[in-house]
């Protein structure tokens, strides 16, 4: 029985470490990516997985070591995994409708710094021209709204 407890504790610890590592990858993606759409992808996909792994690890730890099953942890798992992607989808949709900067591969420098802002990679005229094109596209498609 003691060996089983140790194995489950090890599984819980590995899940916590994996969740922390994936959260670190998510943070790097948020800093590295150039526009709101890529950043929202990094924030949603990997942080949802990191929270999932972390909470499952905590749930296993509590069940094995204290014999306590937390319904709150289970509800947190369900709530976060349902609301995080939906919330980020709404943020990305609002950004798209408001004409947010959209990264294009040809605009970026090949060896840009990790902290280089997306606006520093493009000229003001190019950004204004793209914003004007997006506005014309929006007027064409959403004139009934």
Swiss-Prot record:
Molecular function GO labels: sodium:proton antiporter activity
Bilayer topology: Multi-pass membrane protein
InterPro entries given in the database record: PhaG_MnhG_YufB
Keyword Nucleotide-binding belongs to the record: no
Residue spans crossing the bilayer: 11-31, 51-71, 72-92
Residues making up the signal peptide according to the UniProt record: none
The keyword Ion transport appears for this protein: yes
Gene Ontology CC, one term: plasma membrane
UniProt subcellular location: Cell membrane
Broad class of the protein's primary localization: membrane
Pfam families: PhaG_MnhG_YufB
Record keywords, A-Z: Antiport, Cell membrane, Ion transport, Membrane, Transmembrane, Transmembrane helix, Transport
Family named by the database record: Belongs to the CPA3 antiporters (TC 2.A.63) subunit G family.
Complex and partners: May form a heterooligomeric complex that consists of seven subunits: mnhA2, mnhB2, mnhC2, mnhD2, mnhE2, mnhF2 and mnhG2.
PANTHER family reported for this sequence: ANTIPORTER SUBUNIT MNHG2-RELATED (PTHR34703:SF1)
Listed name of the protein: Putative antiporter subunit mnhG2
Species per Swiss-Prot/TrEMBL record: Staphylococcus aureus (strain JH9)
């Amino acid at each position: 029985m003691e060996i089983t407890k140790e194995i489950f504790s090890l599984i819980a610890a590995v899940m916590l470490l994996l969740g922390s590592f994936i959260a670190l990858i998510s943070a790097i993606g948020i800093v590295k990516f150039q526009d709101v759409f890529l950043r929202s992808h990094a924030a949603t996909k990997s942080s949802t997985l990191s929270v999932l792994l972390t909470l499952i690890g905590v749930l296993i730890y509590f069940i094995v070591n204290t014999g306590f099953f937390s319904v709150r942890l289970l509800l947190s798992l369900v709530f976060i995994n349902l609301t995080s992607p939906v919330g980020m989808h709404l943020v990305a949709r609002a950004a798209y409708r408001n004409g947010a900067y959209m990264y294009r591969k040809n605009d970026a420098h090949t060896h840009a710094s990790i902290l280089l802002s997306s606006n520093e990679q493009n000229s003001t005229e190019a950004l204004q021209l793209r914003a004007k094109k997006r506005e014309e596209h929006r007027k064409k498609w959403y004139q009934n709204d």
